[in-house]
């Protein structure tokens, strides 16, 4: 465990500092999480779950960490240029891994709704955060989750009380800002009580072209009869590594839509684990990745049908160019008591060059006999027949290829239930295919 040793030493030397600049609720599980990290280490390809991405190697370089919580000299409102200008949102920022609340414009949210710093909310409402924090993100099973829990000092809490509807979408912008190679450990806690409804857009941007390593753990609790949409849009630099673990628990008759879109990145590893714990729960899990050069995108999903009468729909699409690498592994588990399960899983992929590589592993484990489940995966190239037809109608070959690729990913974009975001994504994807979106576009400093 050579890679891990530098972080073991670092934690031993700085644990008091880490705790000093955090909150008691976050500090309580820190020692146990660190012990789990010491035991597990960082995942390597030897673990089946990580066989397409060697996470361990990305922790080898030296990175700076802001454990003393020094102020970052940046005003997000001056440098951030929203890529969704026509969508009215309640806008918030996280700079590196700290919630930005300096000179924050007042946002009018419904009574009882909380959106703010995890550290501050944990101090103001310790019982609320304690009830949920770390309950889904099991540090005993994943080394990255254990590492994040040991080092995370702040993050975001989004709490919606019972039967409250948040009409205006919430937009959370994660900005990476540093002058040296830098590591951040982000944390997001989302709680929707019974009958609540909300929509959240999370955007990842990098202001500087240094090497960034971002670990992220998101926990989502969706109570009975809730409706929750969460969209993640990644537009960072090729020198950015993102390792994200998302945990979701749904109660009876909840409806959750998760859509993660990687438009530009360096290396991305996303893990999504969904537990359908109440009858009538429905999860729609979607993803899209567009990669070129040496970019790497790996999505690993798990949907656990633990009770009867639940529905899961899963759709992931990749377009890979140059020497880029994509991976998708999706498990749907139907437990013995989960009768009347309805589950569909689809993974479709386009490799635009011979050097692009796509690995796909759909998997069903069914232990109930009265279910309706299907899965399918394909890896191929553009339809030559369609290309020939379009060229015969006077469309240039390059333009025809762009149109076919755009049509291919359009199915994922159309799952978005925010019209302004959907319209903007159509434009951003077209620009990405035309090579006009080849770096972070979210910050005015990136010109």
Mark where each language-model region is:
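Short, low-to-moderate order helix/coil transition modules at the start of elongated helical scaffolds
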Residues: 1-217, 225-227
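Conserved beta-strand/loop scaffold segments within soluble protein domains that form the structured core
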Residues: 111-114, 124, 128-388, 392-395, ...
């Amino acid at each position: 465990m050579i890679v891990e040793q530098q972080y073991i030493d670092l934690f031993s030397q700085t644990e008091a500092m880490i705790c000093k600049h955090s909150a008691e609720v976050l500090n309580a599980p820190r020692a146990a999480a660190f012990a789990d990290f010491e035991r597990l280490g960082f995942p390597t390809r030897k673990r089946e779950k990580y066989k397409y991405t060697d996470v361990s190697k990305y922790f080898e370089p030296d990175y700076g960490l802001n454990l003393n919580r020094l102020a970052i000299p940046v005003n997000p409102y001056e440098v951030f240029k929203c890529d969704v200008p026509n969508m009215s949102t309640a806008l918030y920022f996280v700079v590196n891994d700290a919630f930005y609340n300096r000179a924050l414009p007042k946002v009018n949210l419904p009574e009882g709704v909380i959106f703010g710093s995890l550290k501050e909310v944990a101090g103001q409402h310790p019982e609320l955060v304690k009830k949920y924090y770390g309950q889904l993100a099991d540090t005993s099973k994943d080394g990255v989750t254990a590492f994040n829990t040991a080092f995370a000092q702040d993050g975001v809490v989004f709490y919606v009380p019972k039967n409250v509807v948040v009409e205006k979408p919430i937009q959370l912008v994660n900005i990476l800002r540093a002058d040296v190679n830098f590591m951040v450990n982000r944390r997001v806690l989302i709680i929707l009580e019974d009958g609540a409804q909300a929509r959240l857009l999370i955007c990842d941007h990098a202001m500087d072209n240094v090497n960034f390593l971002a670990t992220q753990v998101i926990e989502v609790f969706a109570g009975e009869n809730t409706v929750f949409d969460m969209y993640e849009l990644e537009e960072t630099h090729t020198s950015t590594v993102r390792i994200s673990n998302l945990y979701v628990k749904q109660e009876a008759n909840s409806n959750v839509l998760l859509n993660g879109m990687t438009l530009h990145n360096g290396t991305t590893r996303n893990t999504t684990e969904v537990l359908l714990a109440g009858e009538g729960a429905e999860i729609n899990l979607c993803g899209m990745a567009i990669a070129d050069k040496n970019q790497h995108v790996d999505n690993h999903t798990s949907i656990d049908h633990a009770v009867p009468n639940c529905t899961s729909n899963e759709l992931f699409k990749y377009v890979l160019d140059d020497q880029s690498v994509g991976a998708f592994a999706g498990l749907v588990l139907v437990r013995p008591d989960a009768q009347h399960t309805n589950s569909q899983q689809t993974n479709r992929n386009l490799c635009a060059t011979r050097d692009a590589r796509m690995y796909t592993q759909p998997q069903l484990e069914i232990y109930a006999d009265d279910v309706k489940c299907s899965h399918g995966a394909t890896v191929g190239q553009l339809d030559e027949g369609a290309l020939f037809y379009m060229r015969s109608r006077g469309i240039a070959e390059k333009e025809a290829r762009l149109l076919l690729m755009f049509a291919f990913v359009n199915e994922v974009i159309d799952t978005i239930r925010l019209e302004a975001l959907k319209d903007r994504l159509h434009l951003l994807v077209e620009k990405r295919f035309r090579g006009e979106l080849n770096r972070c576009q979210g910050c005015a400093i990136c010109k």
